[in-house]
Amino acid sequence: MTTQTLAFEIGTEELPAFDLHNATIQMDKLAHAAFEEAGIPYGEISVYSTPRRIILIATEVPEVTQALEEVFKGPSAKIAFDENGNPTKAALGFARGKGVDPRELERREEKGVEYVFATKRTPEKHVVDLLPTLLHGLITGLSWPRPQRWGTGTDQFRRPVRWLLALLGTNVVNVEFAGLCAGNTTRGHRFLAPGPFTVAHADELLGVLENAYVVTSEAKREEIIRQQIKAIEEKTGLVADLPEKVMAEVVNLVEYPTAMVGTFDELFLSVPKEIIVDAMLVHQRYFPLFTKEGALTNKFIVTSNGNPEFEANIIDGNQRVVAARLYDAKFFYDEDLKKPLEAYVDDLENVVFQESLGTTRAKVSRIQSLAGELATQAGLPEEDITDAKRAAYLAKADLVTSAVVEFTSVQGIMGSYYAQAAGETAQVAQAIADQYRPRFAGDTLPQSKVGMCVAAADKLDTICGLFAVGQGPTGSSDPFALRRQAIGIIAMLQAGLAISLQSAIDFALDSYCSQGIEFDKAEARAQIIDFFVTRTKVNLKDSGIRPDTIDAVLAAQVVEPAVIIARAKALESARSTEPDTFDDLATAFARANNLRNEEAGCAVDESLLEQTEHALYNAITNAQEKVNEALQTDDYAAALQQLAALRGPIDTFFQDIMVMDENLALRENRLKLLNLFVSVFAQVANFGLMAKSVK
């Protein structure tokens, strides 16, 4: 069968970088699905994109589809036809669902039962007749965050579509969209080779574009940019800051990338480096250059989409842009320094934290008290408690400074600089800088316990407040990023912030009550604790802990995230690396748990115990004491060792003692002994939930 290559290009005005990346992924999925649905075979589908185009290439597309004959088994003939042989609703529905005439249904016997069958025949079709609808569907099937309409038409796309190319081999496919008819012409780089260019065959499209200074592969453009930056680094002896997110955006801002080095006046290096880096990366998509020791220099890399022959002009234009940004930054910074950071705190009265929860100034009062409470719980010295409260008081002040209003991503960082300039302690300044950490899973934690107290107070205040007013996460919706903030708190608890989360939640909710916020405290508290437990479960699953291990620990009514994680990891370790220990734990628990009777209680009458029972009783009470000691010091491995040591006594007990004795007093006392045995295990975890792994 003769096959051809299909080339389809949607030419547009410049598409937003991240939208373009998402559209490329969508197009690949849509194309595969569309070809399958249309019954069009193909060899390989590839999608390419640049800021001005989305391209689909499908290889080995046949001229005609294959004729198909599909046979479907339906209901039994007894159900499908009435006594007069007329089709029933069951037969009619079956035929309709398979797209056949009820009169075409056939009866066939299968294993002694007669059924009806439908044969659906799809004739071969000319692919060129199917493609217009298919390709039009690909255009309209793309989902955009904010699609546009242009001209007088009603068609929508992320940016206006300016040309369409659709070729099956040498033949133009008659696709229409937004008043445009597809042809065999494309356009090159906007400045270096605008075109138009005729494409004689679908196989030639990518080559034509390459000759017209268009690098159609996103991966290839990134490779070119990285190679050029590496060459600059080797030549200058400097190191570029290349955040993945910014690189991904830059790659989709250019069709023919050229990396160039620009400079700015060293005078601007007196401004905090974070502002300069923010101005470059976030606002201009330039890559700042640092010394190998990590010091920011006055050099940066700009990735141009223009003609490399005019490098001097391009660099000069970009230097003018960055100079203007940095002049503003320096002006804002200098103006902000004219007042001490503390002077900005009361201005937070004009900043709304959340509609139902009042102002950011009210939040500052809450987190100041909560940070002091957390520092006290953590056993920090008095001077650290004072620093925690001071840092919390000043933490949000930079939100109303000019520099942060203009460069929002440096909030907290600028507050730290302003705190240093105002003579605050180094620990206070650092805690202000660290208040938003960790910002995501795996991010750096605050440097000190004081910083952790401030960061945890801020996050917990937000979580408690939003749950209190019914704004907690629902399903996949988490507009206030509460899950991320909970993960941050859990990470700090794991890192040794020795506080009671339950107590901290109570304190935070009480602070809202004292400020006149009305809500059901008991309900909010329960929801918040459940929220943290759920986040902890996700944390453990992501780290490879088995679900039944997690459930076993949670069944012990543990709610403190750090305790849940430590116990689960100790138990998982015993299961994975100490199989003998776990076997002893599981076997001992299972034997006792199979016979225990919760209604009997645990009040053992020692006067009724025989020698073997006494031995078990003494082993239990001894283990109970040592398990309690181990739990008090968070030594969960030691607690498990103590429980595992009970296997010998319980095995001997079952060998020598008849639990279900005819003497009811002895029977009940022995059941109480087993209940006591199980209760010691239950302090750590419910080993019964791992029953499948016990064998």
Describe each region flagged by the PLM.
Residues 1-695:
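Amphipathic alpha-helical "coupling" segments that flank catalytic cores
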